């Protein structure tokens, strides 16, 4: 894992197309902004895990 230190207003680059900017720090929370192309999905980890779990379950079938 790469560990970086950034201050509010500073940005890091991921590849050529994704930027992550520190917008603010308040207590133990950090607000970040992510700019990415539309074809790159950006999710919080808990949302991403839920999406993966739903995709693995597959479509539910009605037994009528």
Curated annotation (Swiss-Prot):
Gene3D superfamilies: Translational regulator CsrA (2.60.40.4380). One of its GO terms (cellular component) is cytosol. SUPFAM superfamilies: CsrA-like (SSF117130). GO terms for biological process: mRNA catabolic process; negative regulation of translational initiation; positive regulation of translational initiation; regulation of carbohydrate metabolic process. It is found in: Cytoplasm. The keyword Coiled coil does not apply. One of its GO terms (molecular function) is mRNA 5'-UTR binding. Keywords: Activator, Cytoplasm, Repressor, RNA-binding, Translation regulation. Its main location: cytoplasm. InterPro entries: CsrA (IPR003751), CsrA_sf (IPR036107). The keyword Cell cycle does not apply. It holds the Pfam family CsrA. NCBIfam families: csrA (TIGR00202), PRK01712.1 (NF002469). A key translational regulator that binds mRNA to regulate translation initiation and/or mRNA stability. Mediates global changes in gene expression, shifting from rapid growth to stress survival by linking envelope stress, the stringent response and the catabolite repression systems. Usually binds in the 5'-UTR; binding at or near the Shine-Dalgarno sequence prevents ribosome-binding, repressing translation, binding elsewhere in the 5'-UTR can activate translation and/or stabilize the mRNA. Its function is antagonized by small RNA(s). HAMAP family: CsrA (MF_00167). Belongs to the CsrA/RsmA family. Homodimer; the beta-strands of each monomer intercalate to form a hydrophobic core, while the alpha-helices form wings that extend away from the core. This is Translational regulator CsrA. It comes from Methylococcus capsulatus (strain ATCC 33009 / NCIMB 11132 / Bath).
